[in-house]
């Protein structure tokens, strides 16, 4: 026996649900625990808090006294950032979505213009690295996923997935709003993409289960309220679901909630005129502020 290692998984969910109610005594207890860890000698004591974001990202709206307390907590920890290799994840997705070589070659020839437009739009987009292999895998290998869906899927799964609904169950399981359900009605001669709204539909049950008062749950409640006023399969509803996922991910430096991004997602299925009209309709009804 050489010591104790305490791991608090999903600490971010605790912060989202309780940070406003947490007392000064609560933060003091955590500070004392961290300080004890830092002073432990041969009988080591470690405390690991696993969170999606830095503590500083959760305290913006707190009173100054609480902000100071949480900053004191944060300063007592060594911050380690883990960056997943999503390029490998795209390769895994591509390996799951197997294509019959002869038919796929014919499809690429018939839809060369559509595929080139996708490659052209996302070639210099911050969604993917400048590595041409990653872009090729994300667009060609992961087809029929839209490139934005390919970007969102593993990151969303990382944030909210549970055993019954993950990146891999979306790709392999039967049921509604899965890859298989899309392929079952897919026309091999058409250029159709799985857009982010379908990923929203698949993970929606998990949004409901998110911690009440947490950021993701609040986004879900707002999204549901707006969707209740829209036709189920309307372009407006699809756009709202996509915007919701963009805000859940919070990676605005790479995926922004802008009109151009929405046009990029839906221009293979709808005219730019129709997309702009749908966005204008949402703005007019004050379902979105302005894109």
Q: Where on the chain are the PLM-derived regions?
A:
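Secondary-structure transition/capping motifs at alpha-helix termini
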Residues: 1-2, 21-25, 35-45, 232-233, ...
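Conserved P-loop NTPase "ATPase switch" module shared by AAA+ and STAND
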Residues: 2-26
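Beta-sheet entry/capping signal
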Residues: 2-6, 44-49, 77-81, 141-142, ...
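Accessory beta->alpha helical hairpin/"wing" motif in late/C-terminal subdomains of nucleic-acid enzymes
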Residues: 9, 189-205, 276-291
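Substrate-gripping "pore-loop 1 plus following alpha2 helix"
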Residues: 20-33, 61-66
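Conserved P-loop NTPase catalytic core
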Residues: 35-183, 198, 202
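Long, low-complexity, charged/polar intrinsically disordered regions in eukaryotic proteins
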Residues: 99-100, 166-230
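Terminal-proximal interaction/regulatory segments of ATP-powered molecular machines
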Residues: 224-291
């Amino acid at each position: 026996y050489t010591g104790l290692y305490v791991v608090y998984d999903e600490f971010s969910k605790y912060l989202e649900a309780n940070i406003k109610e947490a007392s000064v005594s609560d933060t003091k207890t955590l500070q004392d625990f961290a300080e004890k860890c830092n002073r432990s000698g041969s009988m080591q004591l470690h405390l690991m808090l696993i969170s999606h974001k830095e503590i500083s990202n959760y305290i913006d709206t707190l009173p100054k006294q609480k902000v100071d307390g949480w900053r004191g907590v944060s300063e007592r920890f060594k911050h380690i950032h883990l960056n997943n290799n999503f390029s490998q994840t795209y390769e895994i997705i591509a390996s799951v979505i197997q294509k019959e070589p002869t038919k796929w070659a014919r499809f690429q020839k018939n839809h060369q213009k559509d595929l080139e437009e996708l490659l052209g739009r996302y070639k210099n987009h911050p969604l993917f690295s400048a590595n041409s292999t990653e872009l090729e895998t994300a667009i060609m290998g992961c087809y029929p996923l839209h490139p934005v869906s390919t970007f969102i899927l593993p990151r969303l799964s990382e944030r909210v997935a549970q055993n019954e609904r993950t990146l891999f169950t979306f790709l392999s399981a039967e049921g509604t709003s899965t890859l298989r359900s899309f392929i079952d009605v897919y026309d091999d001669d058409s250029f159709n993409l799985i857009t982010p709204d379908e990923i929203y539909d698949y993970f929606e049950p998990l949004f409901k289960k998110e911690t009440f008062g947490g950021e993701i749950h609040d986004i879900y409640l707002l999204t549901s309220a707006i969707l209740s006023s829209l036709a189920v399969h309307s372009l407006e509803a699809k756009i709202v679901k996509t915007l919701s996922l963009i805000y859940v991910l919070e990676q605005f430096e790479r995926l922004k909630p802008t009109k151009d991004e929405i046009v990029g997602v839906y221009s293979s299925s709808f005219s730019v005129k129709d997309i702009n009209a749908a966005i204008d309709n949402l703005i007019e009804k004050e379902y979105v502020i302005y894109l």
